Design a protein with these regions (language model features):
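Rossmann-fold NAD(P)-binding glycine/threonine-rich loop
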Residues: 100-121
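C-terminal active-site/capping subdomain that shapes the small-molecule cofactor and substrate pocket
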Residues: 251-355
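N-terminal Rossmann NAD(P)H-binding glycine-rich loop of SDR-like oxidoreductase domains
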Residues: 5-25
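Rossmann-fold cofactor-recognition segment
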Residues: 45-59
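N-terminal Rossmann-fold cofactor-binding loop
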Residues: 32-36
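N-terminal Rossmann-like NAD(P) cofactor-binding module of classical short-chain dehydrogenase/reductase
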Residues: 69-75, 96-97
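Active-site-lining helix/loop region of Rossmann-like oxidoreductase modules
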Residues: 8, 143-299
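Rossmann-fold NAD(P) dinucleotide-binding segment
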Residues: 65-66, 80-98
């Protein structure tokens, strides 16, 4: 194993942002992608130092066993397709990091815990705004407390958009939310629920009023593991509302389960052009509320700037720590592995109730 970091999907927005932060930290990089011209452009923006690797995902993974990098950072979506494929291809001693918030992808990586531990590897899934932000608030609320009876987490990202296509990673997350009939934890079991259920309006510490609804996301799994609560709801401001929720959303899961429809939907959304624009609000927010059988309740917030910036910072911090030998072998979410302080290291600020 060497100390190189392979960044898969290095020409996408998230991949570029992570690569820049790692390069500025002096980490030896291999930029991985399918388009030589775009990879060369990314490398030129970093000073031309990184090594480039062109090819399909399959050919890239075939080369892992020979090169044995220190860490592989996966930003290639949809993660439900790529996450386990990439993690399984990592040779003994090579660590894995992704930025997914897709529930199946998070489950797939966590299911590789024994494989990772046996190989002396650390697999970290959800090392971005999705998963880490809400997970870290809940971990803070539950520190030195017995398991709560009920928890709810809400993610409210505010991100600036650059000109270009949506991209496969974000498209995969969107389709993952739309294709699910909903999930929640009820009586300690992961169960199906109505699409876009549990609506709420939250007033953030700076006075914004934001609407959220529950969905199937990696945040749900992370919140369940962080709290061990019997009832867990994970909600997001990304879930549509209004007439779309009432009439269209309930039918989408069945449509997207038709063979071949889901990849077509991901591909179509990934190609949608978007215009450059500033983020709509100054802050992104993650919120958590926990209630105990005694009647005690606590809630807290994590304040973040741009959600994309936080994702890049979080993935970079996790990668840096793995290169330094931190983290126990196995598969985990970032907050569970490194504690809620990881969110602060990535630029977040906690605002918590005081018991």
């Amino acid at each position: 194993m060497n100390n190189e970091v392979w960044v898969l999907g290095a020409t996408g927005r998230t991949g570029r942002m992570i690569a820049r932060r790692l390069h500025e930290a002096g980490v030896p990089l291999v930029l991985v992608g399918r388009d030589r011209q775009r990879l060369e452009g990314v490398a030129a923006g970093l000073g031309g130092a990184p090594r480039l690797l062109m090819g399909s995902l399959e050919s890239t993974l075939a080369g892992l066993a020979q090169d044995r990098p220190g860490v592989v950072v996966n930003t290639v979506g949809p993660f439900t397709t790529t996450a386990a494929q990439v993690a399984r291809a990592c040779p003994v001693g090579t660590h894995y990091v992704d930025v997914t918030n897709e529930l199946p992808a998070v489950q797939q990586i966590l299911a590789l815990d024994r494989q990772a531990a046996a190989g002396g590897q650390v697999f970290v899934t959800g090392a971005g705004f999705g998963v880490l932000a809400t997970e870290s608030v809940l971990l803070r609320l539950c520190q030195r407390q017995p398991p709560p009876a009920r928890v709810r987490v809400d993610a409210m990202a505010s991100v600036g958009m650059e000109a270009g296509a949506v991209g496969a990673a974000l498209a995969g997350t969107i389709v993952g939310i739309l294709s699910s009939s909903g999930r929640e934890v009820w009586h300690g079991r992961l169960v199906g629920s109505r699409a876009a259920a549990h609506p709420a309006q939250l007033t953030t510490p700076d006075g914004d009023v934001l609407a959220t609804r529950s969905g199937a996301s990696g945040e749900l799994i992370a919140a369940w593991r962080a709290s061990n609560a019997g009832s867990v709801i994970a909600a997001t401001a990304l879930v549509p509302s209004g007439a779309f929720t009432r009439f269209v959303l309930p039918a989408l899961p069945a449509v997207l389960r038709i063979p071949g429809v889901r990849p077509l939907a991901v591909s179509a959304i990934a190609r949608i052009p978007q215009h450059a624009q500033q983020r709509p609000r100054t802050w992104s927010w993650a919120h958590a509320r926990a209630e105990w059988p005694s009647g005690e309740a606590r809630e807290g917030w994590l304040r973040i700037g741009d959600g994309h910036d936080f994702t890049a910072a979080a993935a970079t911090e996790v990668t840096r720590r793995l290169l330094e030998g931190q983290g126990r072998p196995g598969a985990d979410t970032p907050g569970a592995l490194f504690g809620p302080e990881l969110a602060e290291a990535a630029g977040g600020t906690f605002i918590l109730d005081r018991p």
